Each structure stands twice: as C-alpha cells, then as structure tokens.
Amino acid sequence: MANYTAADVKRLRELTGAGMMASKNALVEADGDFDKAVELLRIKGAKDVGKRAERATAEGLVAAKDGALIELNSETDFVAKNAEFQSVADQIVAAAAAAKATDIDALKAAKVGDTTVEQVIADLSAKIGEKLELRRVAYFDGNVETYLHKRAADLPPAVGVLVEYTGDGENGTEAAHAVALQIAALKAKYLTREDVPEDVVANERRIAEETARNEGKPEQALPKIVEGRVTGFYKDVVLLDQPSVSDNKKTVKALLDEAGVTVTRFVRFEVGQA
C-alpha cells in the first residue's frame, strides 16, 4: 500500500516542477516523508526546487514606515487591493514603528488610537468577511534604507526590504538603496558566510557530492567540484558574496567597501513566501 496520497504527488509536482512519475518515485524512496522527497528530487536535478518550495499561497501586502516593516495577509488579492485594507496596514506599521515592535505579540498589543492592532484586524476581518493574518514584523532603529516593490501596478507592494547600515553622506544613502534593490531582486538570506548555519552548509556539501556522483564525475574530482558548487551556493544566498546587480564584475561587498558603507543587518519580506 502506498504511503503517500495523490494530493502529496500533486503538491510535490507543484513545488519542484518534477514529473508525475519522478514525484511518485521520490515519495516511495522517501517512505512518504515529503521533505525528504523534495531533497531527493533536488539531488536528481529537478528544476527550481529551492525557489518553488519557499512559496505559500497567501495574498496581502507589505508596508513600511520609520524602520518598521510588516506583512499583512488576506485570503484574496481582491481584499489586498481594498483601500480600507491598505489603510489599516498603514495604521499597523505606524503602530509598529511607534512601539518599536519586533515580534507579533508585541505588535498585536500596540495601540491604534483607543484600541489595539489585534482589535483593528479583527474588526476589519468581520467587516469584509475574510480571514486576515498579521504574519510578521521587523523593526530596525539605526540608519535604515527601505524599499517596497509591487508585482503589478494595480496591487499593493508585495516585497519589502529594510537595510540597516553605517556610512554617511550621499554615497552612503545611494549604496544602501542599491543594496535594498539587490536584496529585493536576488533574495539574499544571509549577510555573511559566517551567518549561514553549519548544518545548512553541510547539507549543501552532501547534496553537491551526491549530485556529482549521480552525474558520473570521477571520484578524485569530487572535492574540487563540491567546493565550486558550495561557492556557487554562497553567491546565491549570501548578500556580500553576490555579484552586484549594478556592476556584475564586482561583489556587493566590494561596492560597499568603495562607498565606505557597512551593512549591519537586513530583512526581506515577500507576501506568500517563507
């Protein structure tokens, strides 16, 4: 008897882009463990596994103000376009900035006039008939560059970035803005290599080695191949290692060094993604 369902196969295909039989075989090999099946398909070369696996199904928007960034989810993009929904999001992010909120519980308890953020959301949810969720919040209190990006002209911003940095003058502001655009576009997850958890790097090495073996690479060449692929992984996920979108002959770190700017931390929210 199969230890997976048709729904599991469908979900795996949607997340990885793999074919039906490949998805079924991966679930069989993984003994029904969905996450393991995703990893197996990645080793075997399924397209876009990492990118697709991050997707969720929420609609909504991101909003930013004075060092605060929030994600407010709705069930449909129809509600996300609603002026009252967007106005409430503006009130919530203003409350986040005023309260310097860095977690959802603190933000829900923050004041909006005579009531709380939590009550404002509950009232709007009852009025429009959709479940609304305050998904996440961030707050930085240093020099902060903010960038919001729309997926379509008729939709509210779906991608939001905060970049905290040190560096004065026009060059500092321009460099921080360029970095915010970079993060929005290329989705860096970590600031430096040292920020990447050891278990994540170890898993990348293991996957790189297994993939190279599956490709028939000679055993003596594996260490060099693995190092090359791990370096490529760093270029994908580490901000300072990424080639700059404004000058791909230089890394983000090189351009920041030239501008005399140091990024101390950043955060990126995208509606519907982890």
From Swiss-Prot:
Associates with the EF-Tu.GDP complex and induces the exchange of GDP to GTP. It remains bound to the aminoacyl-tRNA.EF-Tu.GTP complex up to the GTP hydrolysis stage on the ribosome. It comes from Mycobacterium sp. (strain KMS). One of its GO terms (cellular component) is cytoplasm. It holds the Pfam family EF_TS. The lineage of its organism: Bacteria, Bacillati, Actinomycetota, Actinomycetes, Mycobacteriales. The gene is tsf. One of its GO terms (molecular function) is translation elongation factor activity. InterPro entries: EF-Ts_dimer_sf (IPR036402), Transl_elong_EFTs/EF1B (IPR001816), Transl_elong_EFTs/EF1B_dimer (IPR014039), Transl_elong_Ts_CS (IPR018101), UBA-like_sf (IPR009060). NCBIfam families: tsf. PROSITE patterns: EF_TS_1, EF_TS_2. This is Elongation factor Ts.
